[in-house]
From Swiss-Prot:
The gene is rpl23. This is Large ribosomal subunit protein uL23c. Binds to 23S rRNA. It comes from Pyropia yezoensis (Susabi-nori). One of its GO terms (molecular function) is rRNA binding. HAMAP family: Ribosomal_uL23_B. Keywords: Chloroplast, Plastid, Ribonucleoprotein, Ribosomal protein, RNA-binding, rRNA-binding.
Length: 110
């Protein structure tokens, strides 16, 4: 019960001005399109963002109810340009689970 009160206090104290910068773009691959059937969406987020901040940002931007957030830091991939070898920039991936009645329209109809 104490944890719930603490978590609610954190959610109320988050500033909504910085939330738009946390979520960068949705990640759309074969695996993530399969996750859409389970009402899970995948986003690239700021590497310093916490799960609580990601949850608040998704709820604020898309006006949906988030039930869970899973995050991971994928390894950097090596890329070569000619004889020079470099690495892709670091990013953080968040898999967001929504309530059963909510959904996000990632593919708008034209």
């Amino acid at each position: 019960m104490l944890y719930l009160k603490y978590k609610r206090y954190i959610m109320d104290s988050i500033d909504s001005r910085g939330l738009l910068d946390l979520v960068k773009y949705p990640i759309i691959t074969d695996k993530t399109t399969k996750l859409l059937e389970e009402n899970q969406y995948c986003f690239a987020v700021d590497p310093k963002a916490t799960k609580i901040n990601i949850k608040a940002a998704i709820q604020y931007i898309f006006n949906v109810q988030v039930t869970g957030v899973n995050t991971c830091h994928p390894p950097k991939k090596k890329r070569s340009i000619g004889r020079f070898v470099g690495k892709r920039p670091h990013y953080k991936k968040a898999i967001v689970t929504l309530a059963s009645e909510d959904s996000i329209n990632l593919f708008p109809e034209t």
